[in-house]
Structure formats: C-alpha cells, structure tokens
Curated annotation (Swiss-Prot):
Substrate binds at residues 208, 259. Heme c 5 binds at residues 270, 309, 312-313. The keyword Isomerase does not apply. GO terms for molecular function: calcium ion binding; heme binding; iron ion binding; nitrite reductase (cytochrome, ammonia-forming) activity. Pathway: Nitrogen metabolism; nitrate reduction (assimilation). This is Cytochrome c-552. It comes from Shewanella sp. (strain ANA-3). Keywords: Calcium, Electron transport, Heme, Iron, Metal-binding, Oxidoreductase, Periplasm, Signal, Transport.
Length: 473
C-alpha cells in the first residue's frame, strides 16, 4: 500500500487524469458496450439475419472511383483544402471507416494529438460515435484531433446508427442531428413513421459544418437556422462570417458543401409527395421463405425496379432510366460550365492580387466567387440530385454560372485598371497530377506518409479496439 502511495505521488496530474479516464472507460465497457448503443453490427446477424446480410452486401461496391482524376478542375476549385489532395466517389456503408482512414484528407497522424483533421470527421462514419457521445458527452467527444478516435471508431455505419438498441425502432442517434430537426420545426419524436424513415438518413446525408466558437469548437452543426435552401444557408454562413478555408489562389473565404441530399430531396417531386429515402433505396423485399423485410443494401432504385419505382410508376424501367439519364446529362453540362468559369475566376483573382489589388477592391469579387462556388458545390455534392430534384439542381447551377461570370467581369475591369489587358494564363490542368503540380502539391510525400501510417498506425488502432471490445458483455 505504501509503495502504491509513492507511485501515485510520482504521477503528474495530467497522467493521473489520463489513467483515470482510461480506467473509467474500461469499467464502463466491461458492463456493456453502452446503455443505448451496441456498436458491433455483427451482434445482430442472427436476430435480424435478413437485414444484416443485405446490409453486409453494401461491401459489393468495392470499386474505388477517383473523382479528381475524372475531373481535374476539382483540384483547382479546392486549392488549399483537403479535397484537392484526394476525393473518391462514395461507396457503400461497409466502407465508411475504411475510406476515411485511407483518404489523404485525414493525413498521416503519428499520435492522438497529430494530424490535420478534428474528431468531428468521424461523426457520420460509425455507431461508435453515438456510443462515445453517450460515454463522454458531446464536449468530450468533439475535443481533439481525428486521430484520437482511431482506436475507438472501428465499426462501420450500421444497425445502431438508425435503430434503438436491439429493436427495429428508428432513432436519431446524433444529438446534433436531433437539434437540427427541431430547428426546422420537425422534431423526430413528433414525426410520422414515413418522415422518420428519411430523417434517420438526414442525420448524415446533409450539409453541416464544424463550429469555431470557443465554447463549441469542433462541434458538428447543420446550418439550418434560417432554413434549408441553398440561399438560406448561404445567408446564414455570411451572417456568422464562416468559412471552411481560404482558397490558395484567389484568397476567397470559401464554403465547402458536404452532401445535402436531405435538403435537396425535400425540394424534389419525391420529397414533396412523401416518398421517403427508404421507399426508393431500401425497399421491402421477400426472402426465400416468403417473408418480407427491409433490404438494407442501400443502392440505386433501378437495381430493384419492381420493388421501388414500379410501386408508383406505370412507365417501364427503360423509359424512367432514359429520363433520369437525360436529366443527369443536363446537370453535368451546367456543372462543367460553372467549373470552367470558377477555375478562370480563381486564377484571375490571383493575378489581381499579384498586380496590387487591395482588399477593398477584391471584396465584392471574392463574395461573388464564394457564392458561386458554394452553389456549384451544393448542387454537385448532393449525390443523386439528378433524380431527387433536377430542376433545383439546374436552377442552383445556373445561379453559380451567373455569379462566377459576375466575378470575372469585375476582375476584367480591375485588371485593366491595373494595366493587365491580356488574358490571364491558365496552366495545364488537364490531369489530376498536372493540376496538383500547378498548385505545388508534393503528392509523392503525402502518399508515402499515408502508406507508412496505414502500415504502422492502423494495426495498433485495431489491436486497441479488439482489446476494448473483448471486455464488452
């Protein structure tokens, strides 16, 4: 006992607090995973076999599509931000944790206090997130760097993200999402079953940002205080003078849209007619014993046409697919026009700074660029918008083109005033590698650091998680 007292005295206050925290967490874990959340999806594979097996089939979307390689302009549009390093098309829920670990955007942290990203980057990736919030509170969960959560957030998006523990009953598992629904006058506990089916998806398939206020630094918040349209959120961000980053070329205080699928779905024909996300992406199907269940392989409705589209539409699959492809082509065309204007605007703004433009002269120009790119990003980041709300997508992209053009007209006038009358040269950005090189990005170094991280750090995270989960009852 005396020896123990001496050891205690030698421990610093910081190390003692850390030891106490670890001990407390293991004591809690020894009781059960969490009172409200069982993060281990495999626990439910027998009780809810059909749902579990179909959920597991989301692993079949194993192909990785490099969005930057497919559209190198994105590198320039996101210059100075993590997405210029690496951005792949989204895959199935089974890959949520894997992909956020592997992306260059999360860096190659050497320890829990290292790396470029905050803890909030885990927030939509795993049922371990609500578990941690229940154990630590939001203040404890959001505090610190992304790497802090590495050994804790290991179970991919699954059962407890959307369901109450051990039951099919739907729930919102993130307090920040619950607050957001209340903000727009649709509290989850008062919603219909049909609305709840979309609201659980709206925990993550939404626009959000990380707060910068001292008392809530790094907290996730949905910018819905003034409404959920692109203009209302833009006005909200402007009012609080928020920006995600400063553009490396134009020095514009930029906004990065996330994936506002819920907001755009609400504005489309399906949302307005009470057709939920589940109706189209998780339909009722019949197993080999003739029993119906909800298919949890979230995917393209056309892959299960008879159980999805055909329950409402009398037209053929070929007809509806044709219409959707036409709409997608129109959205893609306007998207490209907006990108072309924005890329030139960023380079022209960089030139204006170079030849002596003042902040006062640049402010209205940067506002136009900020608003144009926000609107472009909002439309394209809303995956499936060509099916959900094509008219809204085209409207938003049209305003993006207009605002980018406005910025370029002002830039032409300002550049002429500064003596620049020739067109501003745009470097070769025809490939992802050339675009990244034009920005001076050392991709070899970033990739090497990431590979070392995957080799040296990830196995340690998994081993720590395995030991912790072994104490669960």
């Amino acid at each position: 006992m005396q020896h123990g007292d001496e050891m205690m005295k030698k421990m610093t206050g910081k190390s003692f607090a850390l030891s106490a925290l670890v001990a407390a967490s293991f004591m809690a874990a020894g009781a059960m995973a969490s009172d409200k959340t069982e993060p281990r999806n495999e626990v439910y594979k027998d009780k809810f076999a059909n749902q579990y097996n179909s959920w597991h089939d989301t692993a079949k979307s194993e192909e990785i599509t490099d969005a930057l390689a497919g559209d190198p302009s994105l590198v320039i549009l996101w210059a100075g931000y993590g997405f210029a390093k690496d951005y792949n098309a989204p895959r199935g829920h089974m890959y949520a944790v894997t992909d956020v670990r592997n992306t260059l955007r999360t860096g190659a942290p050497a320890n829990a206090e290292d790396g470029p990203m905050p803890m909030a980057c885990w927030s939509c990736k795993s049922p371990d997130v609500p578990r941690l919030i229940e154990e630590q509170g939001e203040e404890g969960y959001f505090k610190g760097k992304w790497a802090k959560g590495g050994p804790e957030v290991v179970n991919t998006i699954g059962c407890s993200d959307c369901h109450e523990k051990g039951t099919p009953k739907l729930r919102i598992s993130r307090p920040f999402a619950e607050r957001a629904m209340e903000t727009i006058g649709t509290p989850f506990d008062k919603a219909s079953k049909k609305d709840k089916q979309s609201m659980v998806c709206g925990q993550c398939h939404v626009e959000y940002y990380f707060e910068k206020k001292d008392d809530r630094k790094g907290f996730v918040k949905f910018p819905w205080d003034s409404g959920t349209t692109v203009e209302q959120m833009e006005a909200y961000y402007d009012a609080i003078e928020f920006s995600d980053w400063t553009h490396a070329l134009s020095k514009t205080p930029m906004l990065k849209a996330q994936h506002p699928g819920y907001e755009t779905w609400k504005l489309g024909v399906h949302g307005k007619n009470d057709v939920s996300c589940v109706d189209c992406h998780m339909p009722k199907v019949t197993n080999d014993k003739g029993r119906k269940y909800t298919d949890h392989k979230v995917g393209n409705p056309f892959d299960r046409f008879d159980e999805t589209c055909a329950t409402c539409h009398s037209q053929s699959k070929e007809f509806l697919e044709g219409i959707t492809k036409e709409r997608y082509a129109k959205v893609k065309e306007l998207k490209a026009r907006a990108e072309g204007q924005l890329v030139k605007a960023h380079f022209e703004a960089a030139k204006a700074w170079e030849v002596g433009a003042t902040e006062a002269e640049m402010k209205p120009i940067l506002t136009d660029i900020r608003h144009a790119q926000w609107r472009w990003d909002f439309a394209i980041a809303s995956h499936g918008v060509a099916a959900h709300a094509p008219e809204e997508a085209l409207r938003i992209l049209g305003t993006a083109v207009d605002k980018a053009a406005d910025a370029r007209v002002k830039l032409a006038q300002l550049l002429a005033k500064k003596g620049v009358t020739d067109a501003v040269a745009i470097p070769d950005i025809s490939t992802k590698a050339k675009a990244q090189a034009a920005l001076g990005m050392d991709m070899d170094k970033m990739n090497a650091e990431k590979e070392a991280f995957k080799k040296d750090v990830l196995p340690k995270w998994d081993e720590e998680a395995k030991k912790r989960e072994a104490t669960y009852k």
